[in-house]
């Protein structure tokens, strides 16, 4: 997330362009609620923050129930996140997701233990997460990494590597001649 943040409405336009179905994409709906709710945390206490908070909480619950996508406003999500297929996507409130990442259906970014409830994954830029993948704990996924379908990641993944299997094994890309 190295690029400057242009603001919630510019980010919404980027997110809409990034999803093939645009306004009809459930992934876009979830990101729209996130983009509109996250700036509320920076506001001072007051009636506007309270009313906006109630609206965004209701909208967030609607997205969770209707689309099966949970993106808490406390998570830090970079630009142009693409949610390829909706359903079963859970992101921990302390997670960090870099720019140009891709999440597929049934992905979990969560903590590993009740004793460390704030430990959450950090995804670098351009990370692709396959369907059904689970990334748990305070792990860092490097830039351009690929997490395979149904992989269970419990340790750091270096930049450009692939993590596949349960538990995930790390495979470095083969150098090209």
Which sequence ranges carry the predicted segments?
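Left-handed beta-helix
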Residues: 67, 72-73, 78-79, 84-93, ...
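Terminal amphipathic alpha-helical/low-complexity segments used for targeting or macromolecular assembly
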Residues: 1-67, 176-177
